[in-house]
Amino acid sequence: NQNETQVTVTDNEEVKNEEVKQDDTASTGTPDLSKMSEADKRAFFAEELKNSAIENQFGKTETIVVNEGTKYQYHMILAFPGTAIASQIEDDATTDATGNVDFTKLMQGAVDNGVISFPQVKSLDFWNYHKGYSEVAAKVLNFLNDGLAGNLE
């Protein structure tokens, strides 16, 4: 009986492996769309969209440490302004087709749109009195990119 059970398990595994080869949804989760009616495609796409939703990124925050480990260390809280505003900030700061970033425009957009939610920075002149402008600029850019990618938690 024990051998019989093992044979059955082996046979079931072989059947399962054969089914996986025949069923293209097993590995990708996407059925063969060419075999679906338009109505079935739309129903599948609607379900797929529902299942792929993420938590709203708007207002998500991240605390950053600037000049960490030095006597000039301070913390800032960044808040995601939403996809449209974050995208506009980045677009306005992108100088050419190669994707070079104008950090003055990036940081001005971040200040103007409340991306730096604490402390309340009103002007780039804040960094006349605090070290770490370029460090903050890089962290702001990474934060906006993470939000645009839907990766903020």
What are these regions (language model features)?
Residues 49-67:
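Short acidic, Pro/Gly- and aromatic-enriched capping/linker segments at domain boundaries
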Residues 1-5, 42-47:
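Charge-rich, low-complexity terminal tails
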Residues 17-24, 32-38, 42-44, 56, ...:
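Short, surface-exposed, charged amphipathic helix/loop patches that serve as local interaction elements
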Residues 1-16:
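N-terminal acidic, proline/glycine-rich, low-complexity intrinsically disordered segments
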